[in-house]
């Protein structure tokens, strides 16, 4: 009876209820997300070292980031148009196949700056998938379940992180380059499989069918021209602008952390490369405990206070990293712990906050416009972070501290969105 009671209690958990109440696309996309998350997290701790070990410098890494972000703006603009004309499902499949499946194939054979740049540019094709994937995930879901769905998306990625020690073990035995080459090849195969599953088990959303019918006889260039009407509506929405501002700041921070954390802890703090696979595990464990055990106890309709607290914790974490003594694993572990709690508070809410502030009828093109704007505004900072790292590896993280303070000031002026029960 005790076991049955526990199973019954598990079924009644708010996160389980979110999946139970949102079948079809949301459930399918959440369940197959590990096909992206597992290989991505196996590679992520070593991706920068993979380039650095093969002669790509800090400045070149920053240059790759900035160049690809410019290309991403182009793909992002067309992402919303393609999501309307071709449908959310087909556009998602295209982005997964070319932006990840083919890009990872090129990464698996890259050995110089130009090949790494080519792979990164090909990966920009994934931007057309960003808009379509989010539309496919949420358009047939209930608005009040958005934080829960975004929490599930985060959980899918976090569970995948527990596979990260495998890459650490392989790197310890065979070195970075050959291991990462094989992992990129595996990543290519899993993304092709993900594309096939999306084709088989997902369906076009109601809004996607409407937009596809409305745009059937409208040219791509005419739809591109219609952005001139969408841009003013975007600029006049204070709620959207504030949500976009926070998204831009966190996007820049993610660029810094993803590309320069591994260099900082190995090259400046002197920690072993093998630990790079351990840090994501701690991060994932803390976030999972928080999301499963605590997240649902925080009202899903409250955004401002949890976001502000999360950003404050991010700032504390940045200070811990900046002032970490050399060879001090404890400081870095504490940094990871605090960052994980911050991410659990911030990530689902900043995504849901943005979606609740935009017009559902124009979600695809508005999301594309917002994504393009986010990348465009962030693009100079990849090179800047690379230059800062070349001067002093602490400087990129000091820069993120300033960004967190700015984001906190923005959140202070955000109004709580009205969450309705009707379908999105």
Cite the ranges covered by each PLM segment.
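Helix-loop junctions on the cytosolic side of multi-pass membrane transporters
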Residues: 197-214, 412-423
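Helix-to-loop junctions at the C-terminal end of transmembrane segments
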Residues: 76-87, 172, 290-303, 389
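Glycine-rich segments within core transmembrane alpha-helices of 12-TM secondary carriers
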Residues: 150-168, 371-381
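Hydrophobic core of transmembrane alpha-helices in multi-pass small-molecule transporters
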Residues: 34, 103, 114-128, 329-345
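Cytoplasmic helix-loop-helix junction between adjacent transmembrane helices
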Residues: 121-157
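Structural signature of the two symmetry-related core transmembrane helices
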Residues: 90-105, 305-320
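Juxtamembrane intracellular "pre-TM" segments in multi-pass secondary transporters
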Residues: 2-26, 203-244
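Helix-loop boundary and gating motifs at the non-cytosolic
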Residues: 12-71, 239-280
